[in-house]
């Protein structure tokens, strides 16, 4: 069974997600359809880029990932299909694949050119469905598009290493269900830049002196228990390999979250400063 994943900003109130799945099944009944998320903030390509980069590796090679966020084809934005790390991604060329392509060079990218082959009134997602089902059946990328070598990158998804390697400047690119704030700074980038040096994590007027291996890594000496640390700020490299600012056992209605207690917002600056 071929797998097609869906990541959109459609939400679940309306008919859009159900209709999208119906179109996929109509074209390829054998497809296995998996929802990654339909609650991406509207038109937020940074958030979508992080979500897909964090999720894709959980799926088998050959999976087709459809990304329906800010996907309208216009004078500035084309539709593309990319083969990358033996996975396939179908989306708009709006920078949404920036996090992936800074890690590994794509195997092949095509600009989709089948629009004139579809019925009049076909939507952007109709194009994506046709391309995704074609790929899922084993179809070649060259059949549905013209090969290209470059795609758009979004600068806010790229952390900046200082010229003297004394610091890394990043930004909050995603705030999760727990209110934890994920940055665009990866563990690999920190280790490669640190070369054995210790570092502080700074944002606003606050500093975190170390990165924990897991959320519950606290000193339990004396009479302290894990519950005593509820509400404490911490930094961790999350399971996707990105630096995350969090509150231990965060809860918006009780102890608060990194977003509410630390004042962090989408796009806020977070620095790694080497000692």
Where are these regions (language model features)?
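N-terminal glycine-/serine-/threonine-rich phosphate-binding loop
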Residues: 1-76
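Short, basic/aromatic-enriched C-terminal tail that caps enzymatic domains
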Residues: 3, 262-275
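Fold-independent oxyanion-binding glycine-rich loops
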Residues: 8-10, 36, 68-71, 85, ...
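Active-site histidine-anchored catalytic micro-motif
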Residues: 27-30, 45-47, 60-62, 67-69, ...
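A conserved acidic, glycine/proline-rich C-terminal tail/linker
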Residues: 184-264
